[in-house]
Amino acid sequence: MTVGLGVDIVEIARMRRVMERTPSFAAKVFTEAERAYCDSKANPTTHYAARFAAKEAVCKALGTGILVDGMRMTDVEVVRDSRGKPTVALHGQAAARAKDQGVLDIPLSLTYTHSVAVANAVAITEASQVERERRRDVKAELAQQFKEMRGMLDDLSSTTAHKADEIHGQ
């Protein structure tokens, strides 16, 4: 895999119904830190829905589903960096899968409206970095070849002009 992309959308009302019907749902699906974060918000269900969408999006970016090959929902955790930006922390089978695929990073984007939460995740791999460097090298090589050709054309032009001057006796 060069780059994996995952997108998921969750209806907030549906998340609310699931959490009301199954009180143990949050403990099975979200880490303690995720639950503490969501529960600290004015509208916890919105944040639970965004994190659920993130877990699904990350698994899609890794090329698998949740609950596949022993992966648990809590193996994908949404944490916040020092600036408050949501990022991904992988554990267990999710971390093993990412390592096997050479995943270096999984940038994450979360957003929501009054009715839905959406997450987008991109699994950036070693192969994608190598490909980017290769493309950069190709561009540099083409630029160098262009300069060399331009120099040859300039030389040819001045040589041709000099020969023309000789022929016309100047």
Language model regions located:
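Core catalytic alpha/beta fold that binds nucleotide/phospho-ligands
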Residues: 1-5, 9-170
